[in-house]
A protein has these predicted regions:
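Non-globular targeting/processing and membrane-anchoring segments
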Residues: 2-90, 213-402
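Structural recognition of the beta-strand scaffold that forms the well-ordered cores
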Residues: 107-110, 139-143, 169-172, 191-192
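A short beta-strand-turn-helix
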Residues: 84-107, 133
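Thiol/disulfide oxidoreductase modules built on the thioredoxin-like
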Residues: 162-166, 172-215, 374-379
Length: 402
C-alpha cells in the first residue's frame, strides 16, 4: 500500500471513529442507564445525552455537546413530550402555572402526597436541589395527588408544605388529571423535563439521588449550551459526588419485613386478624386474645366503624395491636384531640426509641389528619406494638414502616 493510500485509509478510520462516537453521544437508546433496587425505587427511563459511561469507570460529564469543536444536534425523536399540567384544584407557593410557561427551564416534576413516608424521606434531597439549582435554571414543581380524601383539603396540604419547608411551586391534582396524563401509578415519582419540554429521566420511588442530581446538572449544562452560554461556567461543587443533606433517614429495605398495612375495607390488602373481619359501613365490636396475635396483621379491640378508607372508633376507648418487623413505624391517623398511648413489649415507648410525635410519657394527641411517627429504633427487629386510644372519633388509616 503506498503512502497516499495509507494516509487516505487512516483518515477514513478516524472519521468512522468520530461518527461512531457521535452516534453514541446523541442516541437515547445507546446511552441509557436503567437502575433499580428493592424498595429503593426504579429508574424506568433515563437518558443523559451529555454523560458517557464506560464499564468499570465513573460517569464522566461532557461540559459541551461538542466533539472536536463540531456541533452535533441531539436526536429527540425518541423522547416523550412532557404532558401539560391538567385540570388543577389549586396552587401553593405560586400563581397559576403551566409547564408551557417553563420552557427554557429544566423542570423536575415530583408526584407526591403528604402522608406518604416514602415521599417524606425524599424531602431533604428535594429541598437541597431547590436551594442549589433554582438560580441556575431548575424549577421543581410538586404535583400533589392525594391518596386519601382528606388530602384533597387545601389547608391540610398547605400545613404540610409549611411543616416540611417546601419553597417551590405546588399544584393540587385532586382528580388525578395530571397523574393520569403522565400515566403515573406511584408515590413518589420524579420526571426530569429538559428545557425543550421533553422527558429525559423518570425515577419511581426512593433512592437514585446521586444519579438524579447528575442528570439535573447535565440538563442544566445542556440548557446553557443551547442558549449559547458557556456551559463550562456552570460549575458544580459536587460534580463527582452527591452530599447527603441534613435530615435524611437511612433505610435498609431488605430489613423491613412488614408491608404497608391499611385499615379501611376498600384499601385493605390483608384481612384483619379479628375473626369478625371487615364489614363495610358497619359498626363492629372487636375483641382479640394476645395469644392469637400473628405477625404483620392488624388486630382491633373496641367498637369500630368500618369506613372505606379508615377504621373509626365508636366507643370511648379502643386498642390496636400489631407485631411488626422494622426499625420504625408510622400511622396515618385523624380525629380531634384523642389521646393515644404507645407501648412496645409491654412498656410505654420513651427516650430515643420513641418517635418525634410522642411525649416523654409515650403518648400523643391527634392534632390533624397526617402521618405520626411512633417509634424510631437504632436497629431492625421484631416488635409488639400496642396503641391504646382514648376518645371517640379517632380514625386509623394505615401503618407504614422504615
Amino acid at each position: 500500500m503506498n503512502k497516499n493510500n495509507r494516509t487516505l485509509l487512516a483518515a477514513l478510520i478516524a472519521l468512522s471513529l468520530i461518527a461512531g462516537f457521535a452516534t453514541y453521544f446523541i442516541s437515547p437508546d445507546l446511552n441509557k442507564t436503567v437502575a433499580q433496587g428493592k424498595g429503593e425505587g426504579v429508574t424506568t427511563k433515563f437518558d443523559s445525552t451529555i454523560q458517557l459511561t464506560q464499564e468499570g469507570t465513573e460517569n464522566s460529564t461532557i461540559t459541551h455537546n461538542r466533539i472536536n469543536n463540531a456541533q452535533f444536534p441531539i436526536d429527540k425523536s425518541q423522547f416523550k413530550r412532557a404532558p401539560e399540567f391538567a385540570e388543577t384544584n389549586g396552587y401553593i407557593n405560586t400563581a397559576p402555572i403551566k409547564l408551557a410557561d417553563l420552557r427554557e427551564k429544566v423542570v423536575l416534576v415530583n408526584f407526591w402526597t403528604y402522608t406518604c413516608i416514602n415521599w417524606i424521606r425524599t424531602i431533604p434531597y428535594l429541598v437541597d436541589w431547590n436551594e442549589k439549582y433554582a438560580n441556575k435554571g431548575l424549577v421543581i414543581v410538586g404535583v400533589h395527588t392525594p391518596e386519601f380524601e382528606f388530602e384533597k383539603n387545601t389547608d391540610n396540604v398547605k400545613a404540610a408544605v409549611d411543616k416540611f419547608g417546601l419553597r417551590y411551586p405546588i399544584v393540587q391534582d385532586n382528580n388525578k388529571e395530571t397523574w393520569n396524563a403522565y400515566e403515573n401509578r406511584y408515590w413518589p415519582r420524579i420526571y426530569l423535563v429538559d428545557s425543550g419540554g421533553d422527558i429525559r429521566y423518570d425515577h419511581i420511588g426512593e433512592g437514585g439521588y446521586a444519579e438524579t442530581e447528575k442528570v439535573i446538572q447535565s440538563l442544566l449544562q445542556e440548557r446553557a449550551a443551547q442558549m449559547d452560554k458557556d456551559a463550562s461556567l456552570l460549575k458544580f461543587d459536587n460534580a463527582n459526588k452527591t452530599a447527603i443533606p441534613n435530615g435524611v433517614q437511612s433505610v435498609d429495605f431488605s430489613q423491613i419485613k412488614t408491608p404497608e398495612l391499611y385499615f379501611g375495607y376498600q384499601f385493605a390488602r390483608k384481612p384483619l386478624g379479628n375473626t369478625e373481619g371487615h364489614k363495610a359501613n358497619q359498626t363492629v365490636t372487636y375483641t382479640f386474645s394476645p395469644s392469637d396475635i400473628k405477625s404483620n396483621i392488624i388486630y382491633l379491640d373496641g367498637k369500630w366503624k368500618n369506613n372505606a378508607e379508615n377504621m373509626e372508633l365508636e366507643s370511648e376507648t379502643g386498642r390496636i395491636a400489631l407485631v411488626y418487623s422494622a426499625k420504625s413505624v408510622n400511622i396515618i391517623a385523624g380525629g380531634n384531640g384523642e389521646e393515644i398511648s404507645v407501648s412496645e413489649g409491654g412498656k410505654l415507648l420513651s427516650g430515643t426509641s420513641g418517635g418525634p410525635d410522642l411525649s416523654e410519657e409515650g403518648k400523643f394527641l391527634i392534632d390533624g389528619q397526617r402521618l405520626y411517627t411512633l417509634s424510631m429504633h437504632d436497629g431492625y427487629g421484631n416488635r409488639s406494638l400496642i396503641l391504646d386510644v382514648k376518645g371517640k372519633g379517632f380514625q386509623a388509616y394505615a401503618f407504614s414502616f422504615g
